[in-house]
C-alpha cells in the first residue's frame, strides 16, 4: 500500500489536531515548496530524511524494444533522491 497526500493530511488531522482543510492545505504547501525549489534548480535538503537533487543526463543511444531500431534518447534533467543516514538505518532494519 502506498502513502498518499490524503493519508498525510489525515495524519495531521488525527495526530496534531489540524482541521481537515488546514491539514490538506499544509500538505499541498509543503509539496509546492519542494516543487518550486527544484524548478529553480535548488537542492532540497530534509534533515534526517534525505536530499532531492537535479541531475542532467546526456543524450545516449537507445533501442526501440518492438522494432530493434536504434533511436537516440534525448538529454534531460531528472530529479534524484538520496536518503539520509537516519532514514537508511531505519529502513535497513525492516524485514
Swiss-Prot record:
Keywords for the protein's UniProt record, in alphabetical order:
DNA recombination, DNA-binding, Transcription, Transcription regulation, Translation regulation
Q: Which domain of life is it from?
A: Bacteria
Q: What cellular-component terms does GO give this entry?
A: cytosol
Which GO MF terms does the UniProt record name?
DNA binding; structural constituent of chromatin
| Any one biological process term the GO annotation gives | DNA recombination
Region entry Disordered, spans: 51-71
Compositional bias of kind Basic and acidic residues: 53-69
Record InterPro entries: Hist_DNA-bd, Histone-like_DNA-bd_CS, IHF-like_DNA-bd_dom_sf, IHF_alpha
Q: What does this protein do?
A: This protein is one of the two subunits of integration host factor, a specific DNA-binding protein that functions in genetic recombination as well as in transcriptional and translational control.
The record's subunit annotation is: Heterodimer of an alpha and a beta chain.
Give the family per the record: Belongs to the bacterial histone-like protein family.
User: How is this protein named in the record?
Assistant: Integration host factor subunit alpha
Q: What is the lineage of its organism?
A: Bacteria, Pseudomonadati, Pseudomonadota, Gammaproteobacteria, Vibrionales
